Structures are given as structure tokens and as C-alpha cells.
Amino acid sequence: MAPTLATAHRRRWWMACTAVLENLLFSAVLLGWGSLLIMLKSEGFYSYLCTKPENVTNSTVGGSAEPEPEELSLVNGWLSCKAQDEILNLAFTVGSFLLSAITLPLGIIMDKYGPRKLRLLGSACFAVSCLLIAYGASNPDSLSVLIFIALALNGFGGMCMTFTSLTLPNMFGDLRSTFIALMIGSYASSAVTFPGIKLIYDAGASFIGILVVWAGCSGLVFFNCFFNWPLEPFPGPEDMDYSVKIKFSWLGFDHKITGKQFYKQVTTVGRRLSVGSSMRTAKEQAALQEGHKLCLSTVDLEVKCQPDAAAAPSFMHSVFSPLLVLSLVTMCVTQLRLIFYMGAMNSILEFLVRGDQKTVALYTSIFGALQLLCLLTAPVIGYIMDWKLKECEDTSEEPEEKEGTQGEKKQKRDRQIQKVTNAMRAFAFTNVLLVGFGVTCLIPNLPLQIFSFVLHTIVRGFIHSAVGGLYAAVYPSTQFGSLTGLQSLVSALFALLQQPLYLAMMGPLGGDPLWVNVGLLAMSMLGFCLPLYLICYRRQLERQLQQKREDSKLFLKINGSSNREAFV
């Protein structure tokens, strides 16, 4: 039942559009935890932990019993208290941490087995999580513990759908970074899903009914994946052209090859047949000049015409590359800055308004609504990553021979250098916005915090899109999931520092976030290390390209032709 890669390529626009919608409704919905928390309290989850003393109503007149009504309150007829808040937040902490920690094995599995099975599993887990929450709401006094399992499944299923959607942009060629940014933007904007559901809930809809319908919609995701997603992983645009698919039984081997593999192998056969018998003794020298082994038969053609090992670095080589290490530093610093603000936002607003809960609720709602900006702003960074790639040439392929006019025409940009240049601009721009966000956080002005909300939302969409675009541009497509999972795991572990920072702000600093924000602003300067390294890396690539062109000119001058293979 699974379609082929060629069929999936024809359906790529349908798959991309539905993936954006599915990410918006089913991926990182746990980021809207504040709205879900209110609904869980209204349904009585862990309300049994709140015990109302018998003498509360009789002693509220006395001064000694005044704190009691502040600790116990009624939400939709259910008791709410501090113990309930703590246990529900513990459930959220467990679910969100498992969500981040599982990204690395999830990426490795996806790179090995492809996205189809993981997406089917993720949609099923999300549906089960909705049904578990609904079942727990039917009898919260006995089934509240199900919220732990439900949130873990919710986060796991959402991350499965997010990760698998990041492979779809491989089918869009030079627009790959733009589509990666669109997928990440829809993932980041999914924080508005629970606030939207809360509006339906406040309008009078049944909480259990909403969750059952939501689980049914997740079932539609399952069937969409079942009928449209192929078994094979999506290769990168540099690895395959989906428009060519031929069975080469007449060449002596029966497997199917596509795209550049087709071009490489047929071109090699043509060159082999065009070489005279006097040239055959020098075949090894010709192979060295060409940069890959010359195949002498259909058996050699099938076995030996493989990409050079240097062209596809190993996973460990990619992990210890300076580019990945600096991207991890940038991501860790940015994640800590963003997550601390999300966790401490209510406390920061309370400090600014001196405890006015209505104002805090208003600004919290504004912050939640602004999360949709991620869907609009994330593709901007993807467009920066894809800037002028269509005007570039791929130096990994042999240039076509141009007689007479080669020196007159302006040389095209090198694709790899343009990718590095675009990534440098994207990370520099993102870090400037991050520093600007840190500066606005230092100013104790309430209306200015709306501008901080906007910067926070933009940076959150930009940083994920920039990292995803960088990994897709620099590293092999078969390592994309593993490297993205490693980045998510490391940044999630580093982001755990937000808890001691929050305790320091609420304890010794008396709720004043000034010094914590100063420290985080200073740490944000580390984010400029990556664009500075990319500048040096670009210069290195430019020197290599210049040397290659000089060698090509020298060879042309000696032999009178740009075709090296004619002079073995």
C-alpha cells in the first residue's frame, strides 16, 4: 500500500500542506501548557489532594485564618490548591523532558528506517494520549494518575510528527531550507492549540467530547501517512532526481537507480566505450584525474561506482566538527534564554505590576496569541538560507565545456560557499534579535514587554529554522535526524539550568529578574561565535575554489582543452 518515492514526489505539495496543518494541531501542543492546566483543574485532576478543613468558613473572620482562602479555591466546582499545582507541573516536567531527551534515538531510528513508520506510531500515540486524558476526566478522583502517561505519549507523538515532517523538504530542491523553516514555524506555532481548545471549552463544549474529536482527527493523520508516505527515506536533492527511474536489466543488473546515479553510471559507460584500446593501460591514471574509479564492466558499474568516502563524512566526524559544536553552543544559550523567560514570565509580570492578576492574565493571553507569528516569521529565515542558490553552480559536478566564451561570461557563485554565506547571515541576524530581546528584558516597562513577546516569538522560530537549514545544507541527508536529535538532547539538558535560575530570582533576588537577565544577556554574546566561524570557513572554501580554478586554467593551457579525460 505504501507509495513509491516517485509517487510521493508527485504528491509532495499535498504532503507539505497537510504536514504544516498537522504540525500546527498535533506537534508541540504542550507548549500551551498554561491553558491545559486551567482545563485540568476545571475537570478536577488531583483535586482530591486539596482537603478543606471543617473550620475554614467559621474562622475566616479571624486574622489568623486569613491565609487559608488563598491556599484553597474553587475552580468549576473542584477544589484547587498548591499541592495540585505541584503535581500537575511535575507531570508536565516529566512529559516535556522525555519529549526532549528522546529526540536523539528518534532521529537515529528515522535515519535508518525512514519517516513513515515513525509518523504512523506518532499519530497513534497522540490519539491514545487524548483518549487517556478523556478517560481520566471521567473519574478524576481515581484516574488522575493517567495524566503522566498521557502527557508522555502526547509529547512523544508530537515529536514523531515534527521530526518526520522535517524530511519532506528534501523533495523541494533549492527551496529545502524555506520548507524546513515552514515546518518548524508550524511546530513552534502549535503553542496556540490549547488556548484555542480552551476557547471552545469556555464556550460550553464538553472536555471529554473535545478530546475524543481531537483523537479522531489524529486518526486522519494516521491514514494520510498510510496512503501517501513512502517506506524509503526521502533522499536529499543532491542525491536523487525523482523525474528519472529506469530498470537497467539490459546493462546486466536489475536494481533501480535514479537521478544523478543514472547520470553518473551512464556517463561512465559512455566514457569507457569512447576510450581507445591504446588508452586502456592508463585507466588508473584517468580514474585519479576524474576523482572516482572507472568501471570496466557492468559488474564494476554496479559495485564500484559508489560515492567517495570523503564526500560523505561519518557520523562521528560530523559530531566533532567545529560547525556542529558551535551550533550546539548557540542553541544551548538561546534555548536557556527563551525557556527561562517562558517559565518565569508570570512571575516577571507580577513583579512589574505589583501583583495585579488581571493585568498578568491579559499579558499572558497576548503572549499566547503572538505564538502564531512563528508560522509567518520562520519561513523568512529559510528564505535567507536559500538566498540566490538557484544562481549557483555545483562544483561537485564537472562543468560543461565552453569553447571561446568561457572566459567572457561571469563565473557563477559556488553553491557550497553561498550556503555557508547564507547560514552566516541567518545566525548573525538571529543573535542580534536575541541580544535585542535581552536588552528589552532589562527595562522594567510593562508596555515594552509586548515588544519582548514579539522578539521572543521571532527568535524561537528563527533559531530552530536556522539550525535545521544549516544541518540540511552542510551535512548528509542521512544524518539530518541524528544530528537534529543530538542538538535537541544537548540543548534540553542545558536548559534544565532555568530551574536554579528561577529559584535564585524568586529567593535571594526577591523576585527581581534584573541580575539574571544581565547574566543571560552576557551569555547570549556567545551566539556570535558561530557566524564568526562561518566567515573563516567561507574564506577557506573560497581559497580551495580559487586553487581548483587555477589548476583548471593551467591544465587547459597545457592540453588545449578543458576535458581532462581526453589526455590521459
Curated annotation (Swiss-Prot):
Activity regulation (UniProt): Affinity and transport activity are regulated by a phosphorylation switch state at Ser-274 and Ser-297; increasing of affinity and amino acid transport activity via dephosphorylation at Ser-274 and phosphorylation at Ser-297.
Post-translational modification note: Glycosylated.
Lipid bilayer topology: Multi-pass membrane protein
Residue positions where Phosphoserine is found in the record: 274, 278, 297
Primary role: Uniporter that mediates the transport of the stereospecific L-phenylalanine, L-methionine and L-branched-chain amino acids, between the extracellular space and the cytoplasm and may control the transepithelial (re)absorption of neutral amino acid in kidney and small intestine. Transport activity is mediated through facilitated diffusion and is sodium ions-, chloride ions- and pH-independent.
Family per similarity comment: Belongs to the SLC43A transporter (TC 2.A.1.44) family.
Name of this chain's protein: Large neutral amino acids transporter small subunit 4
Organism encoding this protein: Mus musculus (Mouse)
Species lineage: Eukaryota, Metazoa, Chordata, Craniata, Vertebrata
